[in-house]
Amino acid sequence: MSEPEPVERVVRRQRHTAGTPGPRRRSIVPIVLAVSGAAVLGWWALSGPAVDVAVGTEASQRVATPVASARRVPEWVTRTSAQRAATADAAPTLGNLPDTSCVLLRSNGRTVVEDQPGAAVIPASNLKLLTASAAIDLLGADTRFHTGVAAAAPPSDGVVAGDLFVIGGGDPVLSTDAYVPYEDHPRDLLTSVDVLADRIVASGVRTVTGSVVGDESRYDTVRDAPGWPSRYITDAQVSPLSALVIDDSRATPAAIEGPKDPPAAQPALHAAEVLTRLLRQRGVTVVGTPRVGAAPAGTTEVAGIDSPTVSQLAEQLTRFSDNTTSELLVKEIGKRASGAGTTEAGTAAVADWVRRSSLPTEVLDLADGSGLSPDNRVSCALLVALLERAGPDSALASWLARPGQPGTLQDRMAGDELRDRVRAKTGSLNNVRSLSGWFTPRSGQPVAFAMVINTTASGADRGEEVLSEQLLRSELGYPEVPGLGDLAPRAPRPA
């Protein structure tokens, strides 16, 4: 699913909070007085006369670099100089940011540029970085979600006596073959309901004397999350949430250029209707009408199908900002953590995972898993720490969108030098634009960054996106310092 059009705050709720945001402050990496002293000493050493050194009784060589020289602490001086230059380069962009924003760039564990890194901000879809990372750790990278089809007894002579239950396991990418072309981002990863229907037929089923019954009992039946306006679902930004969703619960494929069909009010009933239709197309007689209900204990599975792995789903939700996948993973996290397949249980488990992962929790307020809710709060410090925890060569880094390639950055930064230097997660809500990920300046030294802009004006637009790109362009030369070879001690020379 694509990033949503601008939205507005509609509802508030009690959220899972791990801290209280600190006051507003705009800061620049401080240059301590010792740096000035070192710089003066360094200048004196580089420009002043050499010092004679006696070796035994004969002064045969002159030391070109005195002991009290900046050349003898090149790493410290280089780091300080790089931070000062980076801050100066970023200053024009930082000066244009709204007060309710945060910025943090870090490289090799050191701050490059910062502006209110601990401020509480609405992250929009940058929250998916947390959801994807937590899902890998809490659910397992190789875990798959199973959709089963079961009956009270195995088919006898091709006849299922009674109902045929399709039991939802939380698979977010169940799709019919006919629906796939109408996805906003055609999926390389999906679970084919057509294949599931073929497997039912292959098991020998020819007649169902009852109904196809949709079972969504693994999760609750709350279709949305706190803070969502109804248009999120009606405009197809996210499916109605359920453990059993087929084709995003759309009644028919959406028109490519026209408005989306409204979603089915009952996702599990819609799923039962879809499977009934597919079975009848394959010559299976289904006597009853589709309905919703929980499968009784002791049923026998007739057929089933597994989803892609959690790792594959996490990659998809990160690169394409898939809201439905994010939300169903959170419900599954809640189910595994506490037995409750709810958004509330899932966000509580994710918040607990953040704390146990030793990530910054001073600002952590979760309302959903996708970032659609304006009730979410995180900090740039948390987002960058999460990226650094994984590293620039991690799976998380590889899932990020790239300019000019399929994903949410396909139409951004594709025509300039940033194209091959940025991997990032985008975010977009009304009054919010965010971008977090990895940036490689010309030096080749990876920089983790987060920039979250919350505006109080009529709404965020392309102008806010330009600011984030402008900031990265300003740091293409990082680190801007003399080379270590220029600062290293000179070789002794003859007296």
Over which residues does each language-model region extend?
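Terminal targeting segments of Actinobacterial cell-envelope proteins
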Residues: 1-25
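C-terminal region of N-terminal signal peptides and the immediate post-cleavage residues
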Residues: 40-72, 144, 283
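Beta-lactamase-like hydrolase cores
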Residues: 58-122, 146, 196-204
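Small-residue-rich helix-loop
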Residues: 82, 113-115, 334-495
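Mid-domain, small-residue-enriched loop/turn segments at the edges of structured enzyme/sensor domains
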Residues: 100-102, 157-242, 249, 283-284, ...
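Active-site SXXK
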Residues: 123-141, 212, 244, 274-279, ...
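Short, well-structured active-site flanking segments
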Residues: 137-152, 288-291, 396-397
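A small/polar active-site loop signature that marks catalytic segments
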Residues: 249-394
